[in-house]
Amino acid sequence: MTDIRPFRIDIPQPDIDDLRDRLTRARWTPALPGAEWSKGVPVDYLRELAQYWANEFDWRKIEAELNQFPQFVTEIQGQPIHFKHIRSERPDAPALLLLHDNPGGAMGLLDILEPLSRDFHLVVPFMPGFGFSTPLTSIGWTVPRVAAVFAELMDRLGYERFGAHGGGGGANVSLELGRQVPERLIGLHVNAYVAMPGEDVEGLTEAEQARMATVERFMQDGFGFNIMMSTRPQTIAHSLNDSPIGLLAWVVEKFGEWSDPAAQLPEQAIAKDRMLTDVSIQWFTGTSGSIAQSYHDVAHDPGAWGPKDRVTVPTAFVLSAGDVTIRRWAERDANVARWTEFDRGGAYIALEAPELVITDIREFFENRP
């Protein structure tokens, strides 16, 4: 099937009522002795956030905001792919593919869409198995396969040449597009990209050494999220799909841990309603299992961890205060055409400081052929 069908988000009211009912009937776990953020989301914090979700968060308002942009669904490789397609009023505008991370989903790019649509034709898909790109119809959604699907999507929309921006997992897919279809790309723009460390560690700056230490701490103390989903996706799916409290804790912890390191609480970096929009989409679509499956697919891809061809497409790297990329290893992976470091923000900088991302994207692509 190559047809493209209009799509509109319209969550049934009984689903919204069921969510609120579950939140108000939560069976709260007792707080562990000495439990602070280092052990996970504190009970008192989560209880207050859950009450806000149940009583103050307005899903219908968010739904209207999400529906302000044209949305569509198509099928590629047997998989439904949901995407926003926002045409610029500029007839000569270049096309820009925007790729999300997790948590965050395509919602994590919401605040940069209207400003960027003045200068670009935007295509904003959900990854297979995320959000409304469901149900997941097969396994094996490796980074190369996802990249091939999005290259096909851009072809289907009539964009022979385009740019791509991605953060985190979206950065990995963006760079893979640079390997698969370099002749079609006018440039790549990425943030929250993690370049695998090399052996050349001599001469690292103090800032680079601090980034290495952050990665080491994450591997020791923060990698459980990835390990659980990449090894037992079905097991964790049972918990997250049936308990909105469990899902809320699972997602909000990552927003807190991976956002601006200066923030003491997640909402000091990312607005509550933005975090709850992502959690709500995951809840209403029932995609906890398919999201976990995507981690399993990537982790079990034999080609994921070995050497890769260097990306020759001009690539801009954006580093927030919480990023860990080291330039010499980024240059090993890609043709670094622009390198921008900010003193604030984290992995979700498009949510935390959208104006920084908007400006950097515009400046980078302004003179790309």
Report the location of each language-model feature.
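Glycine-rich "HGGG/HGxG" loop immediately N-terminal to the catalytic nucleophile
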Residues: 59-61, 107, 127-141, 175, ...
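Conserved alpha/beta-hydrolase
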Residues: 116-132
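Non-catalytic accessory segments flanking enzyme active sites
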Residues: 15-87, 283-286, 290-304
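Conserved hydrolase catalytic core segment
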Residues: 115, 119, 159-210
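C-terminal subdomain of alpha/beta-hydrolase-fold enzymes, centered on the catalytic histidine
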Residues: 229-369
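Short beta-strand element of the alpha/beta-hydrolase
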Residues: 92-101
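The serine-hydrolase catalytic nucleophile loop
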Residues: 102-113
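Conserved acidic catalytic loop of the alpha/beta-hydrolase fold
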Residues: 144-162, 172
